Amino acid sequence: MFSLKKLKSKLVGVSFVFSGVIALGTGVGLTSEHKYEHSPTLVLHEGETNSVGPRKITSEPWFYPVVGAGAGLIVVSLLLGLGIGIPIAKKKERMMIQEREEHQKMVESLGIIEEQNKTEAIEPTEEVNTQEPTQPAGVNVANNPQMGINQPQINPQFGPNPQQRINPQCFGGPMQPNQMGMRPGFNQMPPQMGGMPPNQMGMRPGFNQMPPQMGGMPPRPNFPNQMPNMNQPRPGFRPQPGGGVPMGNKAGGGFNHPGTPMGPNRMNFPNQGMNQPPHMAGPRAGFPPQNGPR
C-alpha cells in the first residue's frame, strides 16, 4: 500500500503528462490546418466547390485534445480528493475512538476512587461503634441483677437518686441528717433530706423570717392573718375578696362595693365616681380626692 506522499507525487505527475499531451496535440492540429488553408494550389474534387460554409465542431482539429484534457483533469482531481480525504477521515475517526476510550477509562477510575473513599470513611465509624466501653481503673462496680437492656447505667456509689451522697458505711444509701460536720470555710447549710418535722429549723441570721406556708399551723407573731375571711379592709383601700364582704352580683357600683347590684352601669364616673363606702368617703390627709368632682 502506497503512502500518502507517494500517491500525491504520482497523481501530480500524471496530471502534468496529460496536460502536456493535450497541449502538444492541439498545437500540431492547428499548424496542419494553417498550412492547408494557405497552400498555393487549390485542388477541387468532384462535388466540391470553392465556397466557405459551416463545419461541425467535431471536425475541428482542437476538439478532441481539449475534451481529453478536461476529462483528464477531472479524473486527476477526483483521485487527489479521494486519496487525500479518505486517510484524513480515517485518522480523525481513530482519534475520536481513542479519545472516547480514554474518557471511559477516566470515568471508571473516578468511580473506583469514589468507592474506595466511601469504604475508607465507613470503616473508621464501624470500628468506633464496635469498640467496647472500658471501665476506669480503681473503680469497683457491683453486680446489679435488676439492670436490663433498656435501664440506664447507674453508678452504685451514688445510687439511683442523684441527690444521694457517698456513704462509707453503706454504698448508695441515703445519709442520715447532721452526720457530716461543718467544713472549714463553708457556711453551715440546713439539711436537705426529707423526713424532718416542720418548724424544726431556727431562723437564719441575715434573712427575714417568712410566714408559715403549711395549713393548720398557727400564725407567727407580728404577722397578719393569712386565712380567708379574716382580713379587714385597710383604711383608704377597697375591701379585698374573702375579707368579710361576699363577692358576686351583690356588690354595688365600682369595684365589689356593697349596695347596688352589678350591671353595665356600675362605673358612673366622672359624675358619680366609684361609689365609695362610708368609711372611704373623705380624701386622705395630704392627698386630693380620688373620685367624683374635684
Curated annotation (Swiss-Prot):
Annotated region (2 X 22 AA repeats), positions in chain: 172-214
Region (Disordered): 234-294
Lipid bilayer topology: Multi-pass membrane protein
Subcellular location, principal: membrane
Matches recorded under InterPro entries: Cytadhesin_P30/P32
Domain of life: Bacteria
Cellular compartment(s): Cell projection, Attachment organelle membrane
Keyword line: Cell membrane, Cell projection, Cytadherence, Membrane, Repeat, Transmembrane, Transmembrane helix, Virulence
Membrane spanning stretches: 11-31, 66-86
GO biological process, one term: adhesion of symbiont to microvasculature
One GO cellular component term: cell projection
Ranges of the Sequence repeats in the UniProt entry: 172-193, 194-214
This protein's record includes keyword Ligase: no
Amino acid composition bias (Gly residues), ranges on this chain: 241-256
Function of the protein: Adhesin necessary for successful cytadherence and virulence.
The protein's name: P32 adhesin
Organism annotation: Mycoplasmoides gallisepticum (strain R(low / passage 15 / clone 2))
